[in-house]
């Protein structure tokens, strides 16, 4: 569930029918977008912890603007081989399989193109075709090789995982909720991507 405009995932886990379920809502900001959280639980409100998990995923693995993130370090080492965490290696394996399966219609190496548009920056604009043509020579999922936890980017290639970040965040939250027996359901909506999780009642 790494990429998509809309995705719904339902997981059934037994919850006692006579237990009073509370509804908690929260609006957060992560991954450059508004995140709406609705939690149904017989326990504590976990929305703050869930929002923090999404931000942690962004800053530790995915953000190209945070120089301490693994993706930023990969981009900075373009042309060299870099060792990444098992978690990021797993994400990248799925991401590049998606790129391969789509024949490059989805391509995570468009980092330089994204920077050129500067959509979230101070000077968002539509670039000239000549500018795009110049940078397209560094685009192509084939410019990245994966060998376990070792990743090699060809010189000039730049990764941007913005298209998959929300899906990764939803997957991490889903795994976290599987460990929370008090949670009976959740709707997590980072604007362009919706994740649903429900527990079955007896």
Residues of each region from the PLM?
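Loop-centered beta-sheet repeat module
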Residues: 162-175, 186-190
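Conserved beta-strand edge residues that scaffold enzyme active sites
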Residues: 113, 192-193
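Conserved small/polar residues in nucleotide/adenosyl-binding loops
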Residues: 194-201
């Amino acid at each position: 569930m790494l990429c998509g405009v809309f995705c719904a995932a339902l997981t059934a886990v037994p919850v006692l029918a006579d237990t009073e379920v509370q509804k908690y809502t929260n609006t957060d900001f992560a991954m450059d977008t508004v995140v709406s959280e609705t939690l149904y639980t017989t326990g504590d409100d976990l929305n703050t912890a869930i929002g923090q998990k999404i931000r942690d995923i962004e800053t530790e693995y995915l953000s190209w603007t945070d120089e301490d993130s693994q993706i930023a370090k990969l981009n900075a080492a373009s042309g060299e081989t870099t060792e990444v965490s098992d978690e990021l290696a797993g994400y990248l394996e799925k991401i590049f399989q998606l790129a391969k399966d789509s024949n490059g219609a989805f391509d995570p190496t468009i980092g330089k193109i994204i920077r050129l548009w500067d959509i979230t920056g101070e000077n968002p604009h539509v670039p000239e075709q000549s500018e795009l043509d110049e940078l397209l020579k560094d685009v192509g999922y084939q410019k990245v090789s994966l060998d376990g936890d070792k990743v090699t980017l060809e010189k000039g290639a730049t990764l941007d995982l913005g298209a998959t970040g929300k899906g990764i965040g939803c997957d991490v939250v889903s795994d976290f909720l599987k460990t929370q027996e008090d949670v009976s359901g959740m709707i997590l909506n980072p604007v362009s991507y919706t994740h649903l999780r429900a527990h079955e009642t007896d």
